[in-house]
């Protein structure tokens, strides 16, 4: 008889919960809307190029590298830097699938939270199951390399900027009749700093214990993530990412006014629109114009807000995002008149189908899943549920976001430039740590 792993994830900015199993169709995940594109008013976003005698655009590296104290760098090996690029590809691939599932709805997700849960699963996986997980993550690396990369972010990202609060937490909860393999348990504790607990899944107190952990690690933004446990459930893996930061330059609340926001279908609503003029970085290409809004000290964390170019939509933006294209963006200085809504978004996403479509269907298949490295006394189990809950709040002060991801295994029988950036229509946003390049959150806001 096979039993199941349940995976859950959450974060303060967004909460991610993995709690399900399933397969996915073979439809291509392009993120394109099924309905014809709607035309709606376009805000001008014309930027004057800064003076540059070399004729070349300036990358963020050359602009700020001398300004950043090295003690605050996230120190990665060359192999780990390569994993960041692969991880960002995974982030955009996953978000493309999430957006395609409901492209007209605001959402938020933490791909990193999902990656941590998959990384923990990978330590217990064997054979083709391990191969699929590695391919989905895009790493193609050894388990050791993946573990060390995850540990580097857990150890260093929270202290990259003392003025920013970041917490990454992991939980491994085993049903009381499951004996975890020593190597698996050690990896969970040494590389993922995971709390490892043995619980009686037949008791409500175990559900309460895990939900209390979820609430605490998400700063109260996600009160619970597990509805119930079954005695047939074998293991619960949880990841939580909590992020809270103030803008480097705050918006003046007195400048916030109700203004028109035009949705993708052409309908309009009134939203509180924050406003300020600032010297910031921006980039532009044929699909979108983006601005770089820094948090904290201004040198580590930022939210990049992406607004479609004329004739484009956020679906086009999501479709265009890849690790390579993202890395190749050039950010220049400009003095920008910024308007963007004060907003909050919550997401509750079942990830089984999406992870299956991305290339790891066997982890949800009772006949094909191989997690024999987790426990010798329970060789046959599979992932029954993968779910992510996430939440984000953006206001004049800054941003608070969290995500929780859960996996459950269950039994089966610019100085010289000027411009305007008015986010009065749907947009995409990305929260990223600069020195590592790691993407922590991706979302869209569509006025709902």
Predicted regions and their residues:
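N-terminal secretory signal peptides that target proteins for export/translocation
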Residues: 1-3
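Short Gly/aromatic-enriched secondary-structure transition segments
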Residues: 133-137, 251-258, 316-324
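Non-catalytic interaction/Regulatory regions outside core domains
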Residues: 8-11, 37, 45, 49-71, ...
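Non-catalytic, conformational "gating/processing" segments within enzyme and secreted inhibitor domains
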Residues: 104-105, 143-309, 331-415
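Internal alpha/beta scaffold segment
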Residues: 308-332
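Detector for small/aliphatic-rich hydrophobic stretches
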Residues: 6-9, 21-201
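Feature captures eukaryotic membrane-trafficking machinery centered on endolysosomal pathways
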Residues: 106-130, 292-294, 417-448
């Amino acid at each position: 008889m096979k039993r199941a792993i349940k995976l859950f994830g959450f974060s303060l900015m967004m909460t991610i919960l993995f709690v399900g199993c399933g397969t996915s169709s073979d439809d291509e995940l392009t993120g394109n809307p099924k309905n014809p594109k709607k035309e709606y008013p376009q805000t001008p976003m014309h930027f004057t190029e800064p003076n540059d005698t070399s004729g070349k655009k300036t990358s963020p590296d050359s602009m700020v590298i001398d300004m950043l104290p090295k003690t605050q760098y996230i120190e990665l090996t060359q192999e780990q830097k390569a994993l960041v690029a692969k991880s960002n590809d995974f982030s955009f691939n996953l978000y493309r699938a999430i957006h395609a599932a409901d492209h007209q709805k605001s959402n938020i997700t933490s791909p990193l939270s999902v990656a941590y849960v998959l990384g923990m699963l990978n330590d217990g996986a064997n054979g083709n199951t391990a191969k699929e997980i590695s391919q989905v993550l895009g790493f193609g690396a050894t388990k050791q390399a993946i573990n060390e990369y995850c540990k580097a972010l857990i150890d260093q990202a929270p202290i990259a900027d003392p003025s920013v609060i970041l917490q990454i937490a992991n939980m491994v909860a085993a049903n009381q009749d499951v004996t975890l393999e020593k190597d698996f348990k050690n990896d969970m504790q040494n590389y993922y700093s995971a709390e490892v607990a043995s619980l009686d899944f037949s008791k409500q107190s175990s559900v309460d214990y895990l939900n209390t952990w979820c609430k605490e690690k998400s700063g109260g933004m996600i009160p619970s993530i597990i509805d119930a446990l079954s005695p047939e459930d074998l293991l619960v893996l949880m990841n939580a990412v909590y992020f809270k930061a103030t803008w480097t330059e705050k918006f003046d609340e007195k400048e916030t006014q109700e203004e028109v926001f035009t949705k993708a279908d052409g309908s309009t609503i009134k939203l509180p629109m924050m406003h300020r003029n600032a010297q910031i970085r921006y980039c532009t290409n044929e699909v979108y114009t983006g601005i770089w809004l820094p948090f904290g000290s201004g040198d580590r964390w930022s939210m990049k807000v992406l607004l479609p170019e004329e004739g484009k939509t956020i679906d086009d933006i999501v479709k265009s995002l890849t690790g390579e294209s993202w890395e190749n963006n050039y950010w220049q200085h400009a003095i920008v008149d910024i308007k963007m809504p004060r907003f909050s978004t919550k997401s509750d996403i079942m990830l089984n189908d999406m992870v299956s479509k991305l290339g790891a269907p066997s982890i949800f298949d009772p006949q094909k899943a191989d997690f024999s490295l987790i426990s010798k006394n329970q060789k046959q189990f599979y992932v029954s549920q993968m779910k992510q809950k996430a939440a984000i709040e953006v206001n004049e002060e800054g941003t608070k976001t969290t995500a929780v991801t859960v996996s459950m295994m269950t039994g089966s029988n610019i100085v010289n430039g000027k411009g305007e950036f008015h986010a009065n229509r749907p947009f995409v946003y990305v929260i990223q740590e600069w020195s590592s390049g790691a993407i922590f959150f991706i979302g869209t806001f569509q006025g709902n």
